[in-house]
């Protein structure tokens, strides 16, 4: 069990906190209804292999790197970016009266999402509201902890990066 004082529920997030993204491994398990409408030939080649292989890349498990960060840093909020993408999942981990600000220019959108969007002529807001767009998990931390958290995640092979901040 987790001590009550160590539960990460977003209630301590404050203005200026930093949003750190851990990259996803692909589509994960969300948005396949939309994928099925767009992709009709699963043998079609994509990056030198059938697109089905890319679409079925296993979902990354974030437990070990996130637990390592939790042991060393005061993580104020966490969000696993699943169905609903960043717009639906991030606000749930931010305290009332605050909101997450994601700087789209800082995102590292995976090519598979660009491909799906182009093939299906899907509006950007629908893409961001359906898929993780390359962000699998987000940690909300104090600005002073940002570099240390990113370095800790790197020890686990994660190329984490800042994607935004919390504002009132």
Where in this protein do the model-derived segments appear?
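A glycine- and small-aliphatic-rich helix-loop capping segment at beta-alpha/alpha-beta transitions
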Residues: 1-4, 37-42, 95-99
